[in-house]
């Protein structure tokens, strides 16, 4: 690693909440650790079970739909790669931003944002459910790796800077729908955020967040084109572009409709977009589509690097040195792509019907687990349920178990324990 980057972070950034014993299985004379602390953090995330489970969790369409599905896992790998490249350009530690990309959706339940909605409905009286807060809970508590002095799980025991890099919303719920910490995780949250500016995410988290926006805006559209749901020629249609601009202005109040209209026009006139045309799955069409996704990702990532450098200057940037700056015209282009996916994929009537069934399934599994707990819970969760002091804490354990499920397991639990109609 570049020594300049390592020197940008101090012992406070590299501190772990729990001191760990020396490794005992090393061969004599081979105990030297050659990795940086942040490289070790990345390895812990890469090898954890919660990350692997994302392979069977929905990104936009289900992980079993089509031959080349995008899942929460493949999306996280893409976010990590985009973020890592941006980190190199900005002088952040690449391993930090990479692991933040890997872990940014690690708390997502079955069925992605739709499952998040269902669990939030179930837990609304006891702190709600939010995927970002669940990320933090998994990394600091639920994923088994390190025990503290009392024998309780400290999760992966990542460094302070690593946990902060995953934290997009460094605050509790309050009256906001997006938040990063549940109430009973605040001891760990206060440790991570010690000395940090109030409610300001660190630069590494901002880079991860923009890499996430870039990845899902471009790749969700790519998937929509391949599936036949999206025809990019609509960007050149005045009425369709106006509709996208209206949707975008409602979803992103900081962007003016005129900015979004102009963004749709710019996108439609880019050769890499217009050359895709009506996608038909041929070699030429597939190459054109892949060229488009590659060039758009590069456009959006490099614009943020250049704009940030124009404000903050040269040198290695990290933590709270500066804010990530993204040009308005690029934010507008990303917003238009998001609206394409929203209008032609996520608002499809068939898709909405599937989502309603998914939420019902989650509600029914929650009732099953709650009614039969603790025997219905996994060995990792049952002791926490027994030790819980009130219904809110007990429900949180049930929520934790459901959030950990893959979609396949959730459906198996539902099928096995649901009453069957008589023939």
Swiss-Prot record:
A biological-process GO annotation: dGTP catabolic process
PROSITE patterns xref list: HD
GO molecular function, one term: dGTPase activity
Repeat as UniProt keyword: no
Biased composition (Basic and acidic residues): 11-22
Keywords: Hydrolase
Pfam families for the chain: HD, HD_assoc
Domain HD positions: 72-217
InterPro entries: dGTPase, dGTPase-like, dNTPase_2, HD/PDEase_dom, HD_domain, PHydrolase_assoc_dom
Start and end residues of each stretch annotated as Disordered: 1-35
Family: Belongs to the dGTPase family. Type 2 subfamily.
Protein's name in the database: Deoxyguanosinetriphosphate triphosphohydrolase-like protein
Provenance organism: Mycobacterium sp. (strain JLS)
